[in-house]
């Protein structure tokens, strides 16, 4: 499990911002 910023999701070994 990866640590992403609040409001971000982890997918395919990267974090991306969800809106």
Curated annotation (Swiss-Prot):
Disulfide bonds: 4-15
Keywords associated with the record: Disulfide bond, Lectin, Secreted
Cellular component GO terms, alphabetical: extracellular region
Domain C-type lectin stretches: 1-19
Presence of keyword Cell division: no
Location of this chain's protein in the cell: Secreted
Tissue specificity field: Expressed by the venom gland.
Single GO term (MF): carbohydrate binding
Location (main, coarse): secreted
UniProt family annotation: Belongs to the true venom lectin family.
Name the UniProt record assigns to this protein: C-type lectin domain-containing protein 2
Organism expressing this protein natively: Daboia russelii (Russel's viper)
Lineage, broadest ranks: Eukaryota, Metazoa, Chordata, Craniata, Vertebrata
């Amino acid at each position: 499990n990866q640590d992403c910023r609040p409001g971000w999701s982890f997918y395919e070994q990267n974090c991306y911002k969800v809106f």
